[in-house]
Amino acid sequence: MNCVLTEARLVTMQPGVQGYQITEPQTLIIEQGRIQHIGQHIDLPSDAHPISCAGKLVTPGLIDCHTHLVYAGSRANEFELRLQGVPYQTIAAQGGGILSTVNATRKASEEALIELALPRLDGLLRSGVTSVEVKSGYGLTLKDELKMLRAAKALEQHRRVKITTTLLAAHALPPEFQGRSDDYIAHICQEIIPRVAEEQLATSVDVFCESIGFSVAQTERVFHAAQAHGLQIKGHTEQLSNLGGSALTARMGGLSVDHIEYLDEAGVKALAQSSTVATLLPGAFYFLRETQKPPIEWLRQYRVPMAISTDLNPGTSPFADLSLMMNMGCTLFDLTPEETLRAVTCHAAQALGYPANRGQIAEGYDADLAIWNIEHPAELSYQVGVSRLHARIVNGELSYES
């Protein structure tokens, strides 16, 4: 027996059920990293050493399903320039923008990338996160994309957390392929994806499908290559315009479409006819001072599951706090606190391809939990800057975050 929790008020977050589903104080028996038994009256073996939650709320461990937390360099100077009204095109021409992060990341060693990522990861863990998705996309060469993915996977060796890695080589056009985007897509499909699959460095492949990124046709090529190598797909779609990338991703069985500020009703209907999750990224919306909001009412009307994530990255969402994103989901996108908690638990698990073992509290599920010093779950999206986390449990192992 690995762990026993007693007097735990559970917020089970089972999908498809209304409300927080708060239970009376329960006992949880955890064995081999999974929840084996839940009940009010369970006979414990004589050698058990139960941990009393003393009536504290216990939720599923939070899941940050979209991050770029492995990178080198800073974009703080770019932030200042943007506030002064300098256009992004001018910043990029002066060596700034995403390619400045690419240059810094290429120069950094795998070990340096790990050290730089750990403080960002620590911020997420302090907000109750137990699972994190990490994308590549700042290398844009075979060598550097592999380096980023290896660094991301290595984070599990330094912190008690579950890392899911995603290949995002189709994030931007590297300088070496300027004016030859189709050639770069061919390089991704023929060289990068096969190597990533062979070394099992990622479970999914993402594409920035946008007017300043890659076309729908190019995105489809990458998706076909990914699926041919047994990898899942997902898309950065409809952030700046409505190209139809979300509908493509849904039609091809993608895990999630992310950003989606410009998603139209036809795109929402395409999501509703699939199992693809709509991932909202309020941090980027806020940081870029956008005004076009995701179509929340349509997503509700057509019952499309919504996830929320930090989109932690140096250029458009430098935030390492998932509770802040929950608050922004409420204040900027008019979600309810219940919707935001669902968005970082069961729906986020679905967005990563883990709907059957993460994101809710139920027998047989992974023992990834967060124990909170709060009276009601709405407090998680209500107050920002004061940690209410008592402890995390990852694979049945207790961890206290300072």
Swiss-Prot record:
EC code: 3.5.2.7
Main location: cytoplasm
Protein residues bound to N-formimidoyl-L-glutamate: 138, 313, 315
Pathway assignment: Amino-acid degradation; L-histidine degradation into L-glutamate; N-formimidoyl-L-glutamate from L-histidine: step 3/3
Binding site for 4-imidazolone-5-propanoate: 75, 138, 171, 239, 316
Cofactor binding mode and count: Binds 1 zinc or iron ion per subunit.
SUPFAM superfamilies named among the record's database cross-references: Composite domain of metallo-dependent hydrolases, Metallo-dependent hydrolases
Role played: Catalyzes the hydrolytic cleavage of the carbon-nitrogen bond in imidazolone-5-propanoate to yield N-formimidoyl-L-glutamate. It is the third step in the universal histidine degradation pathway.
This protein's name: Imidazolonepropionase
Gene expressing this chain: hutI
